[in-house]
């Protein structure tokens, strides 16, 4: 996957709308909002947006999801997300960063109409964010998402996931980072179709870290990858 370089301060000049929703946003509402926003961005009637949310417990299926990878012992709702990837869990204590951007234009280190570079930029955004919180995270060839060494097990585990959809060169869906979710809820699926590795969270590294800490780090890390300054929507 192509690597993107960090931007210099002189290259950062544009702004991007940034919205954080309190509480738990029902997943179907998020799908509807993202689809409508992506359509409006394509039509030129809305600005690009990064939207930070949490969801009630839910399993979502990407376009490559297999029925055999869903166990769902708690009977959580399941939805077809229409994004790339396989099964993913979302729930309280996990931050979703939905990225709705016009990819026909260059965005910081990401060239126009380059999906591989866009994915690399999102992964870099997550690793840069986690570094600001004292967590060393990395990517692995052939494994989408962001990984780290779980401090409790000493083994590689996923701390951030990624799944996007692109409609008429406008992105929607995005990334997730585990802050303090109930990690046993991930047992209801084979996360992203990968059986060999577990999942972890920020609170396994530092129990004092909060969702607000992550949100601040996400905003601070964004310009270095995508060349725009977050502004409240």
UniProtKB/Swiss-Prot annotation:
User: What is the annotated signal peptide range for this record?
Assistant: none
- Domain of life according to the entry: Bacteria
* Positions bearing the site annotation: Lowers pKa of active site Cys: 158
Location of the protein in the cell: Cytoplasm
Q: What keywords tag this UniProt record? A: Acyltransferase, Cytoplasm, Transferase
**Per its UniProt record, what Pfam families does this chain match?**
LplA-B_cat
According to its UniProt record, this protein's enzyme class is transferase
A biological-process GO annotation: protein modification process
- Which reaction is recorded as catalysed by this protein? octanoyl-[ACP] + L-lysyl-[protein] = N(6)-octanoyl-L-lysyl-[protein] + holo-[ACP] + H(+)
Pathway given for this chain reads: Protein modification; protein lipoylation via endogenous pathway; protein N(6)-(lipoyl)lysine from octanoyl-[acyl-carrier-protein]: step 1/2
Bridged cysteine pairs (disulfide): none
UniProt domain BPL/LPL catalytic: residue ranges = 44-230
Homology family: Belongs to the LipB family.
Q: What is this protein called?
A: Octanoyltransferase
Q: What is the lineage of its organism?
A: Bacteria, Pseudomonadati, Pseudomonadota, Alphaproteobacteria, Acetobacterales
């Amino acid at each position: 996957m192509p690597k993107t370089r960090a931007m210099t301060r002189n290259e950062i000049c544009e702004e991007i709308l940034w919205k954080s929703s309190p509480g738990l946003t029902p997943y179907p509402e998020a799908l509807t909002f993202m689809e409508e926003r992506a359509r409006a961005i394509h039509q030129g009637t809305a600005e690009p947006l990064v939207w930070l949310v949490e969801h009630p417990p839910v399993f979502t299926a990407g376009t490559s999801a297999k029925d055999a990878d869903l166990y769902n012992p708690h009977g959580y709702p399941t939805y077809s997300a229409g994004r790339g990837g396989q099964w993913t869990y979302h729930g309280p204590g996990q931050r979703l960063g939905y990225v709705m951007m016009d990819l026909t234009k260059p965005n910081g280190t990401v060239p126009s109409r380059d999906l591989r570079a866009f994915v690399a930029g999102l992964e870099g955004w997550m690793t840069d964010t986690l570094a600001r919180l004292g967590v060393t995270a990395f990517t692995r060839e052939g494994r989408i998402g962001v990984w780290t060494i779980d401090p409790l097990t000493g083994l590689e585990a996923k701390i951030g996931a990624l799944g996007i959809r692109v409609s008429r060169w406008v992105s929607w869906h995005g990334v997730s980072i585990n802050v303090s979710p109930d990690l046993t809820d991930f047992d209801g699926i084979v996360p992203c179709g990968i059986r060999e590795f577990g999942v972890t969270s920020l609170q396994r590294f530092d129990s004092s870290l909060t969702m607000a800490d992550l949100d601040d780090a996400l905003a601070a890390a964004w310009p270095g990858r995508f060349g725009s300054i977050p502004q409240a929507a």
